[in-house]
Amino acid sequence: DRICTGITSSNSPHVVKTATQGEVNVTGVIPLTTTPTKSHFANLKGTKTRGKLCPKCLNCTDLDVALGRPKCMGTIPSAKASILHEVKPVTSGCFPIMHDRTKIRQLPNLLRGYEHIRLSTHNVINAETAPGGPYKVGTSGSCPNVTNGNGFFATMAWAVPKNDNNKTATNPLTVEVPYICTEGEDQITVWGFHSDNEIQMVKLYGDSKPQKFTSSANGVTTHYVSQIGGFPNQAEDGGLPQSGRIVVDYMVQKSGKTGTITYQRGILLPQKVWCASGRSKVIKGSLPLIGQADCLHEKYGGLNKSKPYYTGEHAKAIGNCPIWVKTPLKLANGTKYRPPAKLLKER
């Protein structure tokens, strides 16, 4: 008898590309890549995920919440990850806002980037006694409060001269905006100004000329000049038609730093401020969040990691995610394929 050593031969459908030998047939491979299919977005496993800024604020946009619309006040949950579900943030209800004049649509996105967000319990400025006053705090029937009375945004006070004695034109006035957050957070201070047609400007403020406004905080200074008139009547969210408009902006104050606002008539003075800390990873997505996933991917939604790599569309992803590669990867777990040996005839 004879004992012959060798390797098992079989047909091999597996081809791998190697660095030194090019394409090589092997007896077995393990796929390392997957191509995901689009799915709904989900909560990220092992961490808190935020969809809407205020999940319990019904019929409210994130901009409503960020501005403190009277019927949109609530707790913003802490989260390590946030879904940017309003890619082009919609307008706020309440009072018509000139969104194209400022960066105010970025405010909800700014807040989403923080892990912890809370609204101050106290006002940052006493609006009634601010320079140029005394003032009464204006309200609007287009901005109903929880009892359906006239209201306004919680983050701002509409400073209307209280009597005819101070209902006159004024030179620029300056008010300091103190830092009032208590835990070293970033303070996001919302402010703005109101303008209308000449008749309404004289009626409210005693001056029909364009007004000047400037904010300064954390090394950033912004200037505005109000537009007088030329606005068509506009109703927001079923409210009363308004001939006026408001311009709204914000400034970020670091711990212990004071900001300033210089203004004339029509100022919307800051009131309650946002105190925000920590970082939340933000990714574009959609709501609702259904179930849990290892990874959130802008193009594919919620993914559960089954392979270390993926092919397909490359986009931002957060969580325990596979790594994008251009072409599929395989790991050879067999031997190099050799064709069946021919039997030799005995002599």
Curated annotation (Swiss-Prot):
Q: How does it sit in the membrane?
A: Single-pass type I membrane protein
- Alphabetically list the UniProt keywords: Disulfide bond, Fusion of virus membrane with host endosomal membrane, Fusion of virus membrane with host membrane, Glycoprotein, Hemagglutinin, Host cell membrane, Host membrane, Host-virus interaction, Lipoprotein, Membrane, Palmitate, Transmembrane, Viral attachment to host cell, Viral envelope protein, Viral penetration into host cytoplasm, Virion, Virus entry into host cell
The cross-references to InterPro entries, in alphabetical order and at most eight, read: Capsid_hemagglutn, Hemagglutn_HA1_a/b_dom_sf, Hemagglutn_influenz_A/B
Q: Name one GO biological process term.
A: virion attachment to host cell
Report any Pfam family annotated for this entry: Hemagglutinin
In its record, the post-translational modification comment is: In natural infection, inactive HA is matured into HA1 and HA2 outside the cell by one or more trypsin-like, arginine-specific endoprotease secreted by the bronchial epithelial cells. One identified protease that may be involved in this process is secreted in lungs by club cells.
Protein family membership: Belongs to the influenza viruses hemagglutinin family.
Another remark in the UniProt entry says: Major glycoprotein, comprises over 80% of the envelope proteins present in virus particle. The extent of infection into host organism is determined by HA. Influenza viruses bud from the apical surface of polarized epithelial cells (e.g. bronchial epithelial cells) into lumen of lungs and are therefore usually pneumotropic. The reason is that HA is cleaved by tryptase clara which is restricted to lungs. However, HAs of H5 and H7 pantropic avian viruses subtypes can be cleaved by furin and subtilisin-type enzymes, allowing the virus to grow in other organs than lungs.
Q: Mind telling me what this protein is named?
A: Hemagglutinin
Source organism per entry reads: Influenza B virus (strain B/Nagasaki/1/1987)
